[in-house]
Amino acid sequence: MKELKYDVLIIGGGFAGSSAAYQLSRRGLKILLVDSKPWNRIGDKPCGDAVSKAHFDKLGMPYPKGEELENKINGIKLYSPDMQTVWTVNGEGFELNAPLYNQRVLKEAQDRGVEIWDLTTAMKPIFEDGYVKGAVLFNRRTNEELTVYSKVVVEATGYSRSFRSKLPPELPITEDLDDKDADVAYREVLLTKEDIEDHDYLRIFIDQETSPGGYWWYFPKGKNKVNVGLGIQGGMGYPSIHEYYKKYLDKYAPDVDKSKLLVKGGALVPTRRPLYTMAWNGIIVIGDSGFTVNPVHGGGKGSAMISGYCAAKAILSAFETGDFSASGLWDMNICYVNEYGAKQASLDIFRRFLQKLSNDDINYGMKKKIIKEEDLLEASEKGDLHLSVADKAMRVISGLGRPSLLFKLKAVAESMKKIKELYLNYPRSPSSLGSWRREVDNVLTEFNKSLS
């Protein structure tokens, strides 16, 4: 079998993998990125396709341009189940043609020295002496099996986790996903019968009957094209997502022309805190495989780019020291936790709270402003839910009709603060991971009890 050597092997060329490749390019490293899809389908993952502009600015990633940019977004409108209350949260973003943008980032990385193979599958890890040292690949273009050795493997295989799942199960990096900590999602892109009103605002509809544990979305891709879909919580025994889509599409997108269907597809999405560790001996895990998706709104492209940025940062540091052990790559965890993971863990608490609410609770809470737009904005941006003394008093008055909701909100705020502080005090070395993880699990267990 043919053997090749690289400094870095990136498995998966979606938003996470392509970002890591882009950030690592022109740094003097020999890098190979492989993806199992043909080039023109890399990055083609069914989702809402919306990304905050702030992510591009912070990470130095190129803005989408031309056909990659389908719509500029100025905010989100959030609808209560009874449609009587609408909150508006302002913020700039892009509605993307995600595959086109993804492929351009890959092409730029390629132009800067990264080698890219499409139609190539990582068959199994090379695992020796407790380290991931590469992978056995099968290239369907050349119809050959190859052994590729590398100092670091970046696992960016998405929800399938198809590479790290083949590692010895005792490694912390192989952590599995509870079905209830994931959403099943489905979406279609259709043309509309007439121009969309306020086409620069995304619409999100919360309803525990039409999308239990998730939400419906209506994301304009211009004046007469829309990405419409829904997510529902996994592991709950709910009916097929296609049943919900067919039954309720007219309620949320009455303006679409069903004969003008452009794209359709479904996906599974992790909606929890990130992996307890995203780095181990010779390996870093990013993107959906590292559970980097926002637990509340299910968006994963921005946080995937953050994880790619952190992977590049940790890898460059490891090459400076020559240490590719878990300790040498530990900066991956520190970087991601500080950039996004602490907030994400806090939002995992908020997600659990929202999924337990009834439609009546949500209608009442939004109408009476027991939960406010400012709460949502602060939670989404920082992972915080701060309630001042005066604010608490006003909420008590508003919440007299539903004291249990107010009590739960207090428990939510406290648990969000606890878990965020734990993540901001993430262990500085692998030796402390086990005790820290037990503390996190205790917070989650206690919070789940408070919701019962």
UniProtKB/Swiss-Prot annotation:
Cofactor entry: FAD
Pathway(s) the chain acts in: Membrane lipid metabolism; glycerophospholipid metabolism
InterPro entries tied to this protein: DGGGPL_red, FAD-dep_OxRdtase, FAD/NAD-bd_sf, Geranylgeranyl_Rdtase_fam, Geranylgeranyl_reductase, GGR_cat
Temperature section of the record: Optimum temperature is 55 degrees Celsius for the reduction of GGPP to the hexahydro-product H(6)GGPP.
Similarity comment: family membership: Belongs to the geranylgeranyl reductase family.
SUBUNIT field: Monomer.
Record's protein name: Digeranylgeranylglycerophospholipid reductase
Native source organism of the sequence: Sulfolobus acidocaldarius (strain ATCC 33909 / DSM 639 / JCM 8929 / NBRC 15157 / NCIMB 11770)
